[in-house]
């Protein structure tokens, strides 16, 4: 059989049950209070967050405006400094004191000196070449003049000799013609005298041994042919001398 508790124990157990129920009720109430306080704190924190956000936003905007203002001031200051530096450099360049101007200027002046020296040397060479060319042309002109003078002298000498030869031939032809006419006249006079002489006293033609040329022409025709041959030979001889010459 099961053992039943006594009355005292039963009362104690009931008292303990009531105290446990009271404790549970208090715990529930504390939890409700805690949840309520949390809700209130959350509402308060949300309100505080909005205010903090606005406050921080306004602070950030003000800081940004300050930064923009400082940046504009720095930018303006930098612009003024750069402008003053450029003006200073411009003044130095105008006064020929700027290193950006003096250093390249020194290099250019050195290059100018070198180029002037090279130009002077080149000028000397050009003058020597021109002088040598002038002397060569002058010498060539003198040689050409001398050769032309010699050629002219030879030409005139040949022409004069040709004229002298022609005059000599003409004189000889005239002498021959005069002799021929004298002989002709003498022969005519002698033939007339021979006709008057008796045939026994006439001279007989001499007999010639060896080659003998019998001319079928009259003496006047032979004389004309001989004169023409002499003139032709006199005309050919100067041309032959020119062809044989240099």
Curated annotation (Swiss-Prot):
Keywords: Apoptosis, Coiled coil, Cytoplasm, Isopeptide bond, Nucleus, Repressor, Transcription, Transcription regulation, Tumor suppressor, Ubl conjugation
Subcellular location: Nucleus; Cytoplasm
Bias-annotated ranges (Acidic residues): 11-32, 40-52
GO biological process: apoptotic process; negative regulation of cell migration; negative regulation of DNA-templated transcription; negative regulation of NF-kappaB transcription factor activity; negative regulation of stem cell population maintenance; negative regulation of transcription by RNA polymerase II; negative regulation of transforming growth factor beta receptor signaling pathway; positive regulation of anoikis
Pfam families referenced in this protein's UniProt entry, alphabetically: Sds3
InterPro entries in alphabetical order: Sds3
Coiled coil location: 51-98
Post-translational modification: Ubiquitinated by a cullin-RING-based BCR (BTB-CUL3-RBX1) E3 ubiquitin-protein ligase complex containing SPOP, leading to proteasomal degradation.
GO CC aspect terms: cytoplasm; nucleus; Sin3-type complex
Cross-link Glycyl lysine isopeptide (Lys-Gly) (interchain with G-Cter in SUMO2), sequence positions: 184, 242
GO MF annotations, alphabetized: NF-kappaB binding
Region spans: Disordered: 1-57
Domain of life: Eukaryota
Entry's free-text remark on domains: Contains an N-terminal anti-parallel coiled coil formed by two BRMS1 chains; this region can form homohexamers.
Record family assignment: Belongs to the BRMS1 family.
Function according to Swiss-Prot or TrEMBL: Transcriptional repressor. Down-regulates transcription activation by NF-kappa-B by promoting the deacetylation of RELA at 'Lys-310'. Promotes HDAC1 binding to promoter regions. Down-regulates expression of anti-apoptotic genes that are controlled by NF-kappa-B. Promotes apoptosis in cells that have inadequate adherence to a substrate, a process called anoikis, and may thereby inhibit metastasis.
Subunit structure: Homohexamer (Potential). Interacts with SNX6, HDAC1 and RELA. Interacts with ARID4A. Identified in mSin3A corepressor complexes together with SIN3A, SIN3B, RBBP4, RBBP7, SAP30, SUDS3, ARID4A, HDAC1 and HDAC2. Interacts with SPOP; this recruits the protein to a ubiquitin ligase complex containing SPOP and CUL3.
Protein's name according to its UniProt entry: Breast cancer metastasis-suppressor 1 homolog
Species the sequence originates in: Mus musculus
Primary gene name: Brms1
